[in-house]
Each structure stands twice: as C-alpha cells, then as structure tokens.
C-alpha cells in the first residue's frame, strides 16, 4: 500500500492486460471465475462488458440492489462486487478505462469530501481497493473523479471542476496530460454551480462521439446554457435535450439527485433509467425521449430513490468495464 501511495505522485508505465486476467473476485457468483463469467456475456463490437458495484451497496441498499441485479440477470449482463470500498460511489474512485482498454487510476481527493470528518472516513482508498481486487492500473497524481469523465472513442468530456481540483497546474498543461492519459481529445464543459460534485455525468452523456444528450437547456440556468452552447459549437457536437426537474424537497437530504434522468446505467445493449414517481416528475417524458434516442437499445426503468436521496444515481454507483477480445 505504501508503494502504491508513492506511485500516486507520478505516472508509471502503461500496463494493459485483458480484463479476464486481472482476477477480480465475482462475489455474486463465487463458483465462477471472472474468465468464465465474461465468456458467457454477449459480444458487442468485439468487447464484452461487466458491471461492478461496491460490496457496501448490497449491504446498505439490499432492495435496490436486488431490483438492479434482477434487471441485469434478465438481460444476461454480468456483475460483481468490489472489495475494500468505504462508500457506494465506485464510479468516482475506480480507474477510468480508455477506448483501447487501459486503466487510469486518478487521485481521489475531491474538495467536497474535505473538512468533514464523516465524509473523510467514508472516502475509499484507491490503493487499497485496487490491491484488494487485483487491479493493476496506471497511476496519475491528477485529482479527478471518475464521475467527471465521459469517454467515447477518442473524445472525453470533463467538467471545468477539474481545474479547481488541481490548482497547481496550468489549464492547458492539465488538458494535455489528460489527453495523453485518456488517449482522447479533451472537451471541457461548464460545471453546475449548485452541484457540489461538479460531475459531468449528472449533466450530459455521449450518444456517439459527435452527439451528446443532456439536461434540457431551456430549463437550465442562463450562464450554463450559454457556456454549453459555446462548447457544442466549438466541438461540432449535436445536443439532444432530455427532460429533468427541480423542486423536490427533502429536508433530510438537501443534496439529493432526484429529477436527473441522464445518470442512467448503460451496459451492452441495455440502458437502465431511474424513475422517481414523486410530484412534478417527468418520468414518462424522459423514458420516451431516451427510447427515441436509443431505438436499438433495451430501456428498462428502476426505482432508485433511496440512493438518489444520498446524492447519486446509477452511473455513480456502477463501474462498467470492457473486456476486449
């Protein structure tokens, strides 16, 4: 672990291996090896995918866990649990996978977890998690949450929160290093001022490398809409507006994620969309829109509210990996 901690201060040479040789234990189906599990999954564009969740997710939210894994089982999507995690938001502290299959482990030290004893205690140690699960990534000392990285081929979207999280770096130098590590053109989008995480995956998602979907701009703040429109123009992106809603109040959970549909889970040919069922919801509109955007994919819905109240949704709580064949 100490060696791993020291490695966080610089990049080590890239290490790429087929995922089925990395031996992450599949806790859901302990009799199966990871290789056996992946072989049973359908091949999409030469790769297979598997969904990982923190073992704490099953422990803390057993009903929601069952709802999600029942959907995955229904569509023959493999899943497994990650050991040695301290919170359920595995997207943020697990490595980011590039289009070629490399795993890049960024520093996980977000500002929103600092100066709060409760949050500090729940911050997962990336070195411990990687070691416990047999993961051998390339380490970087760039401070960046996985939920703030969206990759499609040779393009990556990251919000400008990455700059304030790395104050000692020049913006252009940081972009260049991210481009090198992620093997992609870096597209910086504006973070939402009222989102304490500043993550890209709560605002937009890739449909393909030239098209993104995102929260309906007509309902967004003017400052964000204008900056986002500039990004769309600069990078020649098509933006598809998806319904969302503000206004749900819960005094015990002021930073909830209820109302955000774009933080869905996408794996293989399946998209799992959260629906909320609360007053003022736009569940039906959002599901219809997502089905229109992805006519060739299966779209399932799920009640994820008990997790959403804690500030995240499906993409936040899953880590989806490709195994290249």
Regions found by a protein language model. Give the residues of each.
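The feature marks the mature, well-folded catalytic cores of soluble enzymes
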Residues: 4-6, 10-325
């Amino acid at each position: 672990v100490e060696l791993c901690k020291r490695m966080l201060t610089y990049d080590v040479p890239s290490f790429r291996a087929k995922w089925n040789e990395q031996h992450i234990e599949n806790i859901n189906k302990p009799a199966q090896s990871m290789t056996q599990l992946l072989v049973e999954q359908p091949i999409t564009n030469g790769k297979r995918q598997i969904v990982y969740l923190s073992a704490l997710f099953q422990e803390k939210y057993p009903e929601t866990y069952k709802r999600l894994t029942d959907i995955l089982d229904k569509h023959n999507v493999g899943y497994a649990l990650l050991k040695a995690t301290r919170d359920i938001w595995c997207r943020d502290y697990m490595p980011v996978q590039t289009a070629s299959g490399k795993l890049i482990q960024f520093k996980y030290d977000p500002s929103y977890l600092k100066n709060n004893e409760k949050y500090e205690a729940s911050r997962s140690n990336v070195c411990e998690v990687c070691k416990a699960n047999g993961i051998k990534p390339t380490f970087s000392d760039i401070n960046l949450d996985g939920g703030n990285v969206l990759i499609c081929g040779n393009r990556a979207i990251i919000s400008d929160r990455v700059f304030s999280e790395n104050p000692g770096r020049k913006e252009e130098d940081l972009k260049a290093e991210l481009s090198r590590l992620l093997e992609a053109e870096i597209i910086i989008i504006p973070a939402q001022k009222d989102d304490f995480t500043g993550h890209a995956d709560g605002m937009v998602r890739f449909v393909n490398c030239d098209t993104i979907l995102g929260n309906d701009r007509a309902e967004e703040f003017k400052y964000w809409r204008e900056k986002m429109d500039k990004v769309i123009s600069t990078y020649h992106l098509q933006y598809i507006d998806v319904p969302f809603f503000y206004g749900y109040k819960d005094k015990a959970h002021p930073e909830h994620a209820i109302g955000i549909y774009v933080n869905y889970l996408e794996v293989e040919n399946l998209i799992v969309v959260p629906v909320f069922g609360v007053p003022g919801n736009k569940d039906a509109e959002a599901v219809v829109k997502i089905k229109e955007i992805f006519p060739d994919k299966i779209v399932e819905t799920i009640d994820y509210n008990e997790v959403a109240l804690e500030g995240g949704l499906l993409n936040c709580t899953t880590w989806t990996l490709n195994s290249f064949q």
